[in-house]
Curated annotation (Swiss-Prot):
It comes from the Bacteria. InterPro entries: Elong-fact-P_C, NA-bd_OB-fold, Rib_uL2_dom2, Transl_elong_fac_P/YeiP, Transl_elong_KOW-like, Transl_elong_p-like_YeiP, Transl_elong_P/YeiP_cen, Transl_elong_P/YeiP_CS. GO terms for cellular component: cytosol. One of its GO terms (biological process) is peptide biosynthetic process. Belongs to the elongation factor P family. It comes from Citrobacter koseri (strain ATCC BAA-895 / CDC 4225-83 / SGSC4696). This is Elongation factor P-like protein. Pfam families: EFP, EFP_N, Elong-fact-P_C. SMART domains: EFP, Elong-fact-P_C. GO terms for molecular function: translation elongation factor activity.
C-alpha cells in the first residue's frame, strides 16, 4: 500500500469504508523542526458525490483501489435515464438524472469527447468528464466595446443551462471554454 506522499490526483482511496476520488492535494510544509509534511486532500465520495476533506502525514499508509475506466459516448435519453455507450464493446451504461445531475450541466447536446465511466467489481460508480468543455453562450447582457481593458464580469447562461461569470466583452452566440471542476471561464473556444 502506498504512503500519502505518493498519492496523485485522480487516484481512488478506500478510507473509513468509503471510496474517495482524489480531486485536489495541498502540501503544507511546517517550519518547525521535526514536524511532518501534511497533505490536505479533497475528495469526492464515489457513491454519494459528497465532497470530503482529510489530512494525512507524508508517511501515513493509505489503501488505494483500482477502478476500471471505460471511454464512453452519450447515446440517448430514456425517460429519466441517460444511456452512455462503451466506445470499444458497445456496453450500455445507464445513469439516472439524479446520479449525474451536476455532470449534465457540462454535457452539450450530442455529447462530448473523453468521457469515462468508473466501475469497481462490476458496479457502475460514476461518470467522469474531461477537465474542460466548449459551450455556447445563449443569454447574457450585450457586449460592451472597449470592455477588454476592465476586469469586470457579468453572468452568462450557456447552452446546457449552466450560469457562470464571463468578461463583459463577450456576447450571446460565442463559444467559450469552461473549466469543469472550478466552473470558470477560461477563454474563447478555438
Amino acid at each position: 500500500m502506498p504512503r500519502a506522499n505518493e498519492i496523485k490526483k485522480g487516484m481512488v482511496l478506500n478510507y473509513n469504508g468509503k471510496l474517495l476520488i482524489v480531486k485536489d492535494i495541498d502540501i503544507q510544509s511546517p517550519t518547525a523542526r521535526g514536524a511532518a509534511t501534511l497533505y490536505k486532500m479533497r475528495f469526492s465520495d464515489v457513491r454519494t458525490g459528497l465532497k470530503v476533506e482529510e489530512r494525512f502525514k507524508g508517511d501515513d499508509i493509505v489503501d488505494t483501489v483500482t477502478l476500471s475506466r471505460r471511454g464512453v459516448d452519450f447515446s440517448y435519453i430514456d425517460g429519466n435515464e441517460y444511456v452512455f455507450m462503451d466506445k470499444e464493446d458497445y456496453t450500455p451504461y445507464t445513469f439516472t438524472k439524479d446520479q449525474i445531475e451536476e455532470e449534465l450541466l457540462f454535457i452539450p447536446e450530442g455529447g462530448m469527447p473523453d468521457m469515462q465511466v468508473l466501475t469497481w467489481d462490476g458496479q457502475l460508480l460514476a461518470l467522469e468528464l474531461p477537465q474542460t468543455v466548449d459551450l455556447e453562450i445563449v443569454e447574457t447582457a450585450p457586449g460592451i466595446k472597449g470592455a477588454s481593458a476592465s476586469a469586470r464580469n457579468k453572468p452568462a447562461t450557456l447552452s446546457t443551462g449552466l450560469v457562470i461569470q464571463v468578461p463583459e466583452y463577450l456576447s450571446a452566440g460565442e463559444k467559450i471554454r469552461i473549466h469543469i471542476e472550478e466552473r470558470r471561464y477560461m477563454g474563447r473556444a478555438d
